[in-house]
Regions:
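N-terminal and secondary-structure boundary signal
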Residues: 1-178
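Single conserved hydrophobic/aromatic residue that forms the stacking wall/gate
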Residues: 177-185
Length: 185
């Protein structure tokens, strides 16, 4: 099948720091207006999962977490803060093992170290969990953007990831919600 795609253009939208309870769609709308960008049919928004999760109040203060026996043992084994290990246990579907500083987990259908918990994009002493239901988050954001701009759009929630047995980071798509026709070529 011949592709109609001639080019891809990407625009970075600078936003203020997303805080717990912020409305990501309202922020996007304001920043798009400021940048004089009007989304068109078929445009796809790529959002960092840490920003979406933060807006959904998925930021946890570690001091409020009391680790259980399993978290204490696994935290020692994997050299992780036992409070963070407690959150890993609560958030993940399965722990496969680990190495120093990383427990290998399946969380919300993704292979992710430490259940995708992110300390790098959180205030000191806090961590950001993955969105509660990332697919629903992507769908909700997409529907609101489509309603606002009266065209079919896509939303991808992704973030940087480290991968087992690989050096460096990748930027995989974690969750999508598209109403656009796609062709696998």
């Amino acid at each position: 099948m011949k592709s109609e795609l001639n080019s891809i253009q990407m625009f970075g939208i600078k936003t203020p720091i997303i805080r717990a309870g912020d409305d990501v769609v309202q922020i996007l709308e304001a920043e798009l207006k400021e940048a004089c960008i009007e989304p068109l049919e078929g445009d796809i928004f790529v959002l960092a999962e840490s920003a979406v999760a933060t807006s959904e109040n998925r930021v946890v203060e570690l001091e409020r977490i009391t680790p259980g026996e399993r978290a204490l043992a696994l935290g020692e084994e994997y050299e992780l803060d036992p409070r963070e290990m407690e959150l890993v246990i609560r958030e993940c579907d399965e722990i496969f093992g680990g190495v120093p500083r990383a427990a290998l987990t399946i969380t919300k259908g993704i292979l992710a170290p430490n259940a995708g918990i992110d300390a790098s994009n959180a205030p000191e002493g806090h961590v950001v969990l993955l969105p509660e239901d990332p697919r629903k988050s992507a769908e909700t954001i997409r529907k609101r953007l489509e309603e606002r701009y009266s065209c079919r759009l896509g939303v991808i929630i992704g973030d940087s990831r480290t991968q087992p047995l690989r050096l460096g980071c990748t930027g995989p798509v974690s969750y999508t919600h598209l109403t656009l026709p796609t062709t696998d070529v």
